[in-house]
């Protein structure tokens, strides 16, 4: 989803120097500093990007003669540029304003340092334009690991999340999980209306932060593991060794998925804690528990053969 110039002005408190056409969309998250273009080099120029002039580009223009500056700026603005932003609160060259006015282009200004401004606006645009989807489930932060709990309605996802919150972990969202793919990472958030709320069957909706404190909720979290609840089946083929990895594709990103069969008497919150701890262990170690068992078996067999 694109962002309009007007939205950008509002969110970054930009000063409007020259207005342009209304509802101009910004459809790419990259930013360009047009130093090479002002020098006359236009190979690989991306005019669809937001153009940002900082101290270096401004000084380059300042050193030009008025005629050369006019020529270079007219050439620059002949391309289909969405907007130009001047950083550091720098003064605007008159030739720049005249060239932009001819093309009816937006000229904006920010007081921020150029590198900091570019970093912030790039992150902002990447977030706004990221592919997005909504899944049914509960997203919690367990030991710093974002865990998406899925399963059919009424199977106990919210109740498990409540138990995890009581044990000191944090809730991101219940029931609806808004997910964005940003640079290969899946970031889950709560819809604004239900942020901080948890629905428990038989009780209704509870305000988690009011009952357990502000430290019990999070605005967003990167999804690392999917925990899928399903009803226990006596003849179910469940992974008992942890060697059969399963993944689920979300917005083109594969996420590890664990199937947890639910039946009375199982402490699901403890299982999820163990899954989070095991995930961290696997990231730090090249040896799995199965490898350790196999090594012990070989050592035991060698000892028996020597007897």
UniProtKB/Swiss-Prot annotation:
Residues 261-266 are annotated as: Important for the catalytic mechanism of dephosphorylation. It holds the Pfam family Hpr_kinase_C. Gene3D superfamilies: HprK N-terminal domain-like, P-loop containing nucleotide triphosphate hydrolases. Residues 198-207 are annotated as: Important for the catalytic mechanism of both phosphorylation and dephosphorylation. ATP binds at residues 151-158. InterPro entries: HPr(Ser)_kin/Pase, Hpr_kin/Pase_C, Hpr_kin/Pase_Hpr_N, P-loop_NTPase, Ser_kin/Pase_Hpr-like_N_sf. Mg(2+) binds at residues 158, 199. Its EC number is 2.7.11.-, 2.7.4.-. The active site is at residues 136, 157, 175, 240. Keywords: ATP-binding, Carbohydrate metabolism, Kinase, Magnesium, Metal-binding, Multifunctional enzyme, Nucleotide-binding, Serine/threonine-protein kinase, Transferase. One of its GO terms (molecular function) is protein serine/threonine kinase activity. GO terms for biological process: regulation of carbohydrate metabolic process. Its cofactor is Mg(2+). HAMAP family: HPr_kinase. Both phosphorylation and phosphorolysis are carried out by the same active site and suggest a common mechanism for both reactions. Belongs to the HPrK/P family. Homohexamer. The Walker A ATP-binding motif also binds Pi and PPi. Catalyzes the ATP- as well as the pyrophosphate-dependent phosphorylation of a specific serine residue in HPr, a phosphocarrier protein of the phosphoenolpyruvate-dependent sugar phosphotransferase system (PTS). HprK/P also catalyzes the pyrophosphate-producing, inorganic phosphate-dependent dephosphorylation (phosphorolysis) of seryl-phosphorylated HPr (P-Ser-HPr). This is HPr kinase/phosphorylase. It comes from Clostridium perfringens (strain SM101 / Type A). The lineage of its organism: Bacteria, Bacillati, Bacillota, Clostridia, Eubacteriales.
């Amino acid at each position: 989803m694109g962002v309009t110039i007007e939205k950008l002005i509002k969110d970054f408190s930009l000063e409007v120097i020259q207005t342009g056409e209304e509802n101009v969309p910004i459809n790419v998250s990259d930013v360009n500093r047009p130093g090479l273009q002002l020098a006359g080099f236009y190979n690989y120029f991306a005019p669809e990007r937001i153009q940002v002039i900082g101290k270096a580009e401004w000084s380059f223009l300042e050193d030009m003669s008025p005629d050369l500056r006019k020529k270079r700026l007219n050439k620059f603005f002949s391309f289909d540029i969405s907007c130009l932003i001047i950083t550091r609160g720098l003064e605007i060259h008159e030739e720049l304003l005249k060239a932009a006015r001819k093309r009816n282009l937006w000229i904006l200004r920010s007081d921020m340092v150029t590198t900091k401004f570019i970093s912030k606006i790039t992150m902002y645009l990447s977030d706004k334009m990221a592919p997005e989807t909504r899944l049914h489930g509960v997203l919690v932060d367990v030991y710093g690991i974002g865990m998406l709990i899925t399963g059919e309605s009424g199977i106990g996802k919210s109740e498990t999340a409540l138990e995890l919150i009581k044990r000191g972990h944090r809730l991101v969202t219940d029931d609806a999980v808004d997910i964005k793919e940003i640079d290969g990472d899946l970031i889950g958030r709560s819809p604004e209306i239900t942020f901080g709320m948890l629905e428990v069957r038989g009780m209704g909706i509870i305000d988690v932060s009011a009952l357990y404190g502000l430290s019990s909720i999070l605005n967003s979290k990167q999804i690392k593991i999917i925990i899928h609840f399903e009803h226990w089946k006596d003849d179910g083929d469940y992974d008992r060794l942890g060697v059969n990895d399963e993944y689920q594709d979300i917005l083109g990103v594969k996420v590890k998925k664990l199937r947890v069969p639910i039946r009375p008497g199982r402490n699901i919150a403890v299982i999820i804690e163990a899954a989070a701890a095991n995930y961290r262990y696997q990231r730090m170690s090249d040896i799995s528990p199965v490898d350790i068992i196999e090594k012990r078996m070989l050592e035991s067999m060698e000892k028996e053969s020597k007897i």
